[in-house]
Amino acid sequence: MMITQAPESPSNTLADISEEIIFPPSDLYSDEPPVETELHLEQIMLLIKSLKWLWKERTDFYAVGNLSIYYSPHQKKLKDVRGPDFFVVLGTERKTRKSWVVWEENGKYPNLIVEILSPTTAKTDREIKKELYQDIFRTPEYFWFDPYSLEFAGFYLIHGKYQPVEPNENGHLWSQELGLYLGIVQGLLRYFTSTGSLVPTPEESAEFETQRAAMFDEKSQRLAAKLRELNIDPDTI
């Protein structure tokens, strides 16, 4: 990790929004279009389920994908700016939501955002959304990833401006907010622990446990056979 200063905390007040504004109802549904391709969907779901599995004992975060973030009553006019492909909010209640409504969430914005680039969204993700997340959301960490070209970049918010994250020797980028690395494996963006271990999905974890149980059973059978060769009944041990 090459970092000289910790990323800033996300905005946690509504100081940028006039107190005279009457906010619309908080029961707002997400207004996001379907994801562009099957690969985009796979990538978003992978980020969500891997983190939820890793943090399955935690109740103080919210991780979701392709969900609208309502931060201003005037926002609906900005049709060119959609919700993030994936974002994480820390220090909040882990529960199902129809959308993320900032003024109903104690002014909290995402701690981390990941955008999955595509030919139709890349320019917006690199420019308009980057500026939005930097200047309005003040999100401490912003990453983007192109599942086709494998372009991968990350930024820390330092002194109000996004600064590039330097990769480690494996090309992985460190997220201080998550306490994890992000890196590419077989064309997909994955999490890694601070020691470099891949964070598994629930399915991968179950498969590993099955394989480990099978190996233990095989080892036990070999040991039992060896004991019988020595005229020792393994059931009596």
Regions found by a protein language model. Give the residues of each.
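C-terminal interaction segment
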Residues: 2-32, 36, 53, 71-84, ...
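A structured, charge-rich N-terminal accessory region that forms the first stable segment of a protein
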Residues: 41-54
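A generic secondary-structure signal marking the coil-to-beta-strand transition
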Residues: 43, 59-61, 84-85, 110
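A short acidic/basic microdomain associated with nuclease active sites
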Residues: 57-72
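A structural signal for short, well-ordered beta-strand segments and their strand-loop junctions
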Residues: 62-64, 143-146
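Short acidic/polar active-site loop segments enriched in Thr and Asp
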Residues: 140
